[in-house]
């Protein structure tokens, strides 16, 4: 495993292009485009204000920069650096901006969610979509880019509208039996739309493309309900994370629950492997010390290293007692993610914040638990294989695969708190994001990890 040098960064704004050739990063009002293989700067663009959001077009030919405070979006072209587009929403304001799947239209959501404006880069035409709902996840495209589903609120009722992305014509419009619709998401195959209600009302609704209600699911009543939702890449499973600390798995045939995964504070099953992060001190002989120390060694000396150890059961995990009289209590399953092959599901229970639970979806049982010394901030699966990257806000990155897990210190002068991460399309590298800097972590090839993956039913190794 190797690391690049660190580069300046603002607002954790660092994104790989969809084709994997470029890396975009922001420094205040400047947009920097680098070649992924050499990390040499290819283009440097200057925006009119500090950038708050960036997004690549699906074909990697354009990139948009949103400046919400100014109500501005600027679009840059990689093929024609002298060309650029400026979209000014004026007094309507701007709270969100995204590409359409064709990479030639931009959807801007105005302040107070009064409307969505669809701007065409080719024809310069403008279309308007009324009544978008201000909710957690109110806009979703099918993977093939043909349809847009939009959550709406009008006349004190929730609705969903489905638009054809080729001409933005309304295809279907139907109301949802929800008190306060919180989110919608298409299944990866684009055949089913999941819609879920506010946390005060446990309800998941599943609709077909033509707006027919396929199924409604409610696990319990009179308590805080849904906190997170995730589709498996195969579209066979819908995972629902709840405030009661459980993940419920619905199947795609009957849309009934096939199992539920609990997140207890104590692991009693002796067959469950629990890795605990533990500190280790670097052993440096006097004969090997140099002054001044090399850059990589200086970073290692400034921060203690750590390793994973297999804990013997029963294992008690660190827990938080949620504050019951405040909104958004730190409890329940707040993070869910399936591996790219749909074999594994990773989850975090927010009142056991230091632990990541990894479930074997084929066998519908707990596979491993990873407990860290600090609360888990983020985790993300390798796009090509079952390998999970985790960060906790410290100067380490953690990697797990079915063959085992490792804690890696990020080298460098001073501290490098890893606040976020994102995988390259190939899975060969990983961008580690800090408050003011980012660097790339280069990993071993898929073939070597794949060999270890074939042994996944055996005892994991550290």
Curated annotation (Swiss-Prot):
Cellular compartment(s): Cytoplasm; Cytoplasm, Cytoskeleton, Microtubule organizing center, Centrosome
Keywords assigned by UniProt, alphabetized: Cilium biogenesis/degradation, Cytoplasm, Cytoskeleton, Phosphoprotein, Repeat, WD repeat
PTM-bearing positions, type Phosphoserine: 281
Predominant location category: cytoplasm
SUPFAM superfamilies: YVTN repeat-like/Quinoprotein amine dehydrogenase (SSF50969)
Assembly information from the UniProt record: Interacts with SSX2IP.
Role: The SSX2IP:WRAP73 complex is proposed to act as regulator of spindle anchoring at the mitotic centrosome. Required for the centrosomal localization of SSX2IP and normal mitotic bipolar spindle morphology. Required for the targeting of centriole satellite proteins to centrosomes such as of PCM1, SSX2IP, CEP290 and PIBF1/CEP90. Required for ciliogenesis and involved in the removal of the CEP97:CCP110 complex from the mother centriole.
Protein name: WD repeat-containing protein WRAP73
Lineage: Eukaryota, Metazoa, Chordata, Craniata, Vertebrata
